[in-house]
């Protein structure tokens, strides 16, 4: 029996049409909501969902590229408490996100990539992954409070 996968798993990714045994499809996949029968109407609705998903992904990528053009060359400056070149604590992803928010960029702290824990004053290369295909390189400048 051919089924359309509604959830990713061992059989394939979402939207794949796969052949499985009739009993497996009727007794497990379809009742659990993991798959639906591959009928003509279901195939047409799948194609419509794929087209709408592609349109949404294209819009998200365009928004990420727009953010990349605005963030290009932005240096994030943080003033932290420090003594003898060492920071009291560490600079976190949240600190960088707050600094970017003050500059007018709404970013998700989970998408900020820092190569290592920042515990010293200096300049660091960081990046922001706005989209799986769009990574924005930035500079992080950490200096001591006066």
From Swiss-Prot:
Which molecular function terms from Gene Ontology are attached? Answer: rRNA binding; structural constituent of ribosome
Give GO BP annotations, semicolon-separated.
translation
Q: Which UniProt keywords apply?
A: Ribonucleoprotein, Ribosomal protein, RNA-binding, rRNA-binding
| Keyword Chaperone attributed | no
Q: Where are the transmembrane segments?
A: none
Query: One Pfam family this chain carries?
Result: Ribosomal_L9_C
Taxonomy, superkingdom: Bacteria
Gene3D superfamilies (UniProt xref): Ribosomal protein L9, C-terminal domain, Ribosomal protein L9, N-terminal domain
Any GO CC annotation of this UniProt entry: ribosome
Q: Which PROSITE patterns match?
A: RIBOSOMAL_L9 (PS00651)
What this chain does, per the record?
A: Binds to the 23S rRNA.
Q: Which family does it belong to?
A: Belongs to the bacterial ribosomal protein bL9 family.
Descriptive protein name: Large ribosomal subunit protein bL9
User: What organism, scientifically named, is this protein from?
Assistant: Deinococcus deserti (strain DSM 17065 / CIP 109153 / LMG 22923 / VCD115)
Q: What phylogenetic lineage does the species belong to? A: Bacteria, Thermotogati, Deinococcota, Deinococci, Deinococcales
């Amino acid at each position: 029996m051919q089924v359309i996968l509604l959830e990713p798993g061992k059989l394939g990714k979402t939207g794949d049409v796969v052949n499985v045994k009739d009993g497996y499809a009727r007794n497990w996949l379809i009742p659990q909501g993991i798959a639906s029968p591959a009928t003509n109407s279901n195939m047409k609705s799948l194609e419509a969902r794929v087209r709408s998903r592609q349109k949404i992904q294209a819009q998200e990528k365009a928004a990420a590229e727009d953010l990349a053009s605005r963030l290009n060359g932005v240096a994030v400056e943080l003033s932290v408490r420090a003594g003898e070149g060492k920071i009291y604590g560490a600079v976190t992803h949240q600190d960088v996100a707050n600094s970017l928010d003050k500059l007018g960029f709404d970013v998700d702290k989970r998408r900020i990539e820092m190569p290592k824990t920042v515990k010293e004053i200096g300049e660091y290369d960081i990046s922001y992954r706005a989209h799986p295909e769009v990574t924005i390189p930035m500079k992080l400048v950490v200096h001591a409070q006066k």
